[in-house]
Amino acid sequence: MWTVHIPRRVARQLPKLPQRVQRSLFALLREIEEAGPVRGNWPNYGKLSSTRHHCHLKKGHPTYVAVWEITPAGVRFVEVIYVGTHEKAPY
């Protein structure tokens, strides 16, 4: 079981997201908690670095993405660092 943390700056953005994107995000977070941060079954999943991952929550225009980071040293802790449109994603 993994621990998923949503920082305050990300949590403040959640109500502004479309309902469909919010539902997709919460489904993704449940999967990360249960199965870990590598989510190859999600659309356009990609490993951005050794600790940073991302996937698309909604295709089309605008595309919404989620970016999360895992902590090194074997601690099962994941922090969501961005949820929003593809254009502003911190790649």
Language model regions located:
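A short, surface-exposed loop/turn module that caps and links secondary-structure elements
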Residues: 31-59
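Enriched for short, Lys/Arg-rich terminal
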Residues: 1-3, 12-16, 20-23, 27, ...
